């Protein structure tokens, strides 16, 4: 838009430069020009001002916004600051903090929202963007690629069969449900009598099956009968191997790692093995009271410690004293 305004401004400037030459024509042409209206209406720019300011002083600002406001000065709908129609309406209603002004602003906002919704309904690009956002397959394209392989797995037929104990339990459950349903429907006692011996038979069969299975297990443990699996079947499965996704680094502040409750710091003790014991006596980083406590904890007297510390230097000093002075020749 700004480039368009600047282009119009350049065209208008070039027209104004050629304006004096056009004025040198016949007086009849000048009278015809004076009779023309001050506004020139066009499809693209309905409010183009013919009396555009000739000098630089007449312009509001040299910015494109100032050029645009000067170019469309005669349009009553366009104004900046307190001269805008919306600002004047708010002042007429009593200011921003009044209820009427708030209602007016809410109505304006609602109108803008409705206009935006209508434009979105007309826009094909907006509809396409919504469809892409709702389509879950669009996210899979952006994600890591997946490779699908067919794998052959050989499984014995016994694994597909349900265990015998589970089959008997299922049969018992079915018969119990049938009996309960018969009692709910208040059937005759003869029907109940017909169903109950069957259940007893099934229960006996189940008990026999349990004993048979226990006997088989005992035989297998003893080694009397060995279990031989039947022929294996091949099952084709589609296995999808997902590629490893890159772990996104979580940006966190160093204060987030701290615990909510303050950590109790261990108190510094002088009586134990601390850094104070590693320093020499002259470079002890504390006052005399702390130094005295350190010596008391070690079980030595401060004067003895000083003597021990200065002992090698005193020996050297005594050795130098005992040497005979060399006489100069």
UniProtKB/Swiss-Prot annotation:
A Pfam family hit: DUF5520
Region feature (Disordered): 16-41, 183-229
- InterPro entries tied to this protein: DUF5520
**Gene deletion effect:** No visible phenotype. No effect on testis size, testis-to-body weight ratio, germ cell development or spermiogenesis. No effect on sperm morphology, count or motility. No effect on levels of germ cell apoptosis, chromosome H1t histone association or acrosome biogenesis.
Give the UniProt tissue specificity note.
Answer: Expressed in testis and epididymis. Expressed at lower levels in ovary.
Record field: compositional bias (Basic and acidic residues): 213-229
Function, in words: Dispensable for normal development and fertility.
Q: What is this protein called?
A: Uncharacterized protein C10orf120 homolog
Origin organism is: Mus musculus
Which lineage do the record's taxonomy fields give for this organism?
A: Eukaryota, Metazoa, Chordata, Craniata, Vertebrata
